[in-house]
C-alpha cells in the first residue's frame, strides 16, 4: 500500500506534464493557422504596394493572438544571426509595442 501511495503523485505529475505538452502543441497549431491567414496581407507589405490593406488582411490580423505574433516576430529577428549574417538595420524606428 505504501508503494501505491508513492506512485500516485508520480503518475499525476506525468499526466500533468503530458497535458501541458498537448496544450502547447495545440496553441502552436492555432498560432500557425492564424499566421497562415496573414497571406492575405502579402500584397500590402512589398515595396510599391497599395497603402491600404484589404478587409481580409485586417480581419486576419485582428484574429492573430498578440503573443503568437510577437513570438513569431522575435523568432524571425534571430534568423540573420543564425545564418551568420549581420542584424538587419532598417533605419528609422520600428516599434514592437508591447511585444
Curated annotation (Swiss-Prot):
Keywords: Disulfide bond, Secreted, Signal. Stamen-specific. GO terms for cellular component: extracellular region. The keyword Signal applies. Disulfide bonds join 31-68, 41-57, 58-83, 70-90. CDD domains: nsLTP_like. It is found in: Secreted. It holds the Pfam family LTP_2. Residues 1-22 form the signal peptide. Belongs to the A9/FIL1 family. This is Stamen-specific protein FIL1. It comes from Antirrhinum majus (Garden snapdragon). The gene is FIL1.
Amino acid at each position: 500500500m505504501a508503494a501505491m501511495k508513492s506512485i500516485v503523485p508520480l503518475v499525476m505529475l506525468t499526466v500533468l506534464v503530458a497535458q501541458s505538452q498537448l496544450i502547447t502543441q495545440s496553441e502552436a497549431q492555432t498560432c500557425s493557422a492564424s499566421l497562415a491567414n496573414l497571406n492575405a496581407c502579402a500584397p500590402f507589405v512589398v515595396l510599391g504596394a497599395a497603402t491600404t490593406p484589404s478587409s481580409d488582411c485586417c480581419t486576419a490580423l485582428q484574429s492573430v493572438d498578440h503573443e503568437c505574433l510577437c513570438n513569431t516576430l522575435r523568432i524571425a529577428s534571430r534568423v540573420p544571426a543564425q545564418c551568420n549574417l549581420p542584424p538587419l538595420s532598417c533605419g528609422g524606428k520600428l516599434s514592437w509595442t508591447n511585444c
